[in-house]
Regions:
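Hydrophobic alpha-helical membrane segments
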Residues: 1-303
């Protein structure tokens, strides 16, 4: 019997119902500690590149003056360092939330403290996300660099070269998605193998995902309906705020977005954790035993 997507999703919802504290509360803490906090910090820091771009579009200022005033080395360096720290912090928190959800999917009764698991192995957590970012970028450059060259030449060669450049950009985007799916299980391997290095986890993820990238992509698409429904509901709630003014629209939209994310996030991540357990271990760990699928041999076990 092969991977059963509806069953994996049903088990994720069942795990959410039986986990205490409720995953929605833990997800709320995660969202407050990660996206909300980092967005607040980012809003307090001036983006010199963004400001430079806006002033250039205005065409009322001399570019040399803009560079001298806005792109001050100290300001640029401070902005880049802060953005780097924010990115690393988001990676570490994402590692912790993945740890929490994997434990939830396995009925291990995780708690809020599992959100900090990334800080307990900060070197491995940071390195795995860094390597994934580097590898994904390098693979994308295989098409982006030729696309950039073709775009420059197309200024002299006509629309056909521009069309070719567009195809190369699309190919780069598709390749980036494929590469991202190759590495989707790397964090799970680190969580299951405390002695495994980041590069080894990425290698194991690539091997495990052979023949499974399409299945995981379809699983991700299966949540699209919920996202569309949420978008409609958020728009409806926001329209009700028109009665009270634009401030109410923003507040109601944020509340609707947050409420939906609190439910959908652990649901999606829990389903992915079940996908990992099936592909790598050949069963869903939420069950006390392998059940009727006990005889199934994971394709990954052949490696």
């Amino acid at each position: 019997m092969g991977y059963n997507r509806p069953e994996a999703k049903a088990l994720a919802k069942q795990a959410m119902r039986t986990t205490y504290p409720h995953p929605m509360l833990v997800t709320l803490v995660y969202l407050l500690l990660a996206p909300v906090l980092t967005n607040m910090v980012s809003s307090l820091v001036t983006n010199p590149f963004g400001a430079f771009y806006l002033y250039v579009l205005d065409r009322s200022y001399d570019i040399e003056d803009l560079i001298r005033v806005l792109l001050v080395p100290r300001t640029v360096a401070a902005f880049l360092v802060i953005q780097l720290l924010i990115t690393v912090y988001q990676w570490i928190m994402s590692f912790g939330y993945t740890s929490y959800v994997l434990r939830m999917a396995r009925n291990e009764q995780p708690n809020y403290w599992n959100l900090l698991d990334g800080f307990r192995t900060i070197g491995r957590a940071f390195l795995v996300y860094l390597l994934i970012y580097i590898f994904t970028t390098l693979w994308s450059l295989l098409f982006l660099v030729p696309a950039f060259i073709v775009m420059l030449v197309s200024a002299l060669g006509g629309p056909m070269l521009m069309f070719l450049a567009l195809l190369l950009v699309i190919a780069a985007a598709i390749l980036s998605v494929i590469v991202t799916y190759r590495y989707r299980l790397a964090v799970y391997f680190l969580l299951d193998n405390p002695d495994m290095g980041a590069l080894a986890a990425i290698t194991e993820s690539k091997r495990a995902m052979m023949g499974w990238k399409g299945e995981l992509f379809i699983q991700d698409l299966s949540f699209l309906g919920w996202s569309l429904l949420f978008g409609f509901a958020a728009a409806l709630v926001g329209s009700l705020g028109l009665i009270f003014g634009p401030g109410a629209v923003s507040l109601l939209t944020i509340l609707a977005t947050t409420a939906f994310s609190l439910w959908l996030t652990p649901y999606m991540w829990g389903t992915e954790a079940n996908f990992y357990d099936w592909v790598v271990h050949g069963r869903y760990s939420y069950r006390d035993s392998a059940g009727p699928d006990a005889g199934y041999q994971s394709p990954y076990s052949n490696f």
